[in-house]
A protein has these predicted regions:
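Beta1/beta-strand and adjacent pyrophosphate-binding region of the FAD-binding site
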Residues: 2-16, 32
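A short, structure-level motif marking secondary-structure boundaries and short turns
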Residues: 4-6, 37-39, 96-101
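A structure-centric signal for secondary-structure junctions around beta-strands
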Residues: 5, 28, 72-75
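Glycine-rich FAD pyrophosphate-binding loop
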Residues: 9, 23-45
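Conserved structural-core and active-site-/substrate-pathway-adjacent residues in large, well-folded domains
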Residues: 10-12, 21, 57, 111
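Conserved functional loop/turn residues at catalytic and ligand-binding sites
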Residues: 12, 28, 61
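Active-site-adjacent segment of FAD-dependent monooxygenases/related oxidoreductases
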Residues: 45, 50-111
Length: 111
C-alpha cells in the first residue's frame, strides 16, 4: 500500500469543502478531499450567501463564472405551514462596501 502525505484532509466536497480546498491550495497546502457520493446531489441544501462570501469566491477566482448562475436576492419571507408570515427579511439591491450585493440566491448543485 502506498503512503500518502497531505497537510489537510477535507471530508465532503460541498460548497464549503470545495471553497476551503481552493483557499488552502492557493497557499501551497496539500489537500486530500474525501467525498462519499460519486455524483453531485441534485437537490439544494443551501440556497443563500451574502457579500462577504462573494468576497471569498472573488479570492479563489470564481465570481465571473458563478455570477451567471446567481440571482440577486431582494429579500426572503419565512412562512409557516399555516401560511402565516413569520419573518419578512427585505434586502437592499445595492452594492455594499465589500463590492457586492448584500444577498444572493443560488442552486447548490450548480456551485
Amino acid at each position: 500500500m502506498n503512503n500518502l502525505d497531505f497537510d489537510i484532509v477535507i471530508v465532503g466536497l460541498g460548497p464549503t469543502g470545495g471553497t476551503l480546498a481552493n483557499l488552502l491550495a492557493m497557499n501551497n497546502v496539500s489537500v486530500l478531499i474525501l467525498e462519499k457520493e460519486a455524483n453531485i446531489y441534485n437537490l439544494p441544501r443551501a440556497v443563500h450567501f451574502d457579500d462577504e462570501i462573494m468576497r471569498v469566491f472573488q479570492t479563489i477566482g470564481i465570481t465571473k463564472s458563478l455570477s451567471k448562475k446567481l440571482i440577486i436576492n431582494k429579500g426572503t419571507k419565512f412562512i409557516d405551514d399555516n401560511g402565516e408570515l413569520l419573518l419578512d427579511w427585505p434586502r437592499p439591491k445595492k452594492i455594499t462596501e465589500n463590492g457586492w450585493y448584500p444577498s444572493y440566491r443560488f442552486h447548490q448543485p450548480d456551485l
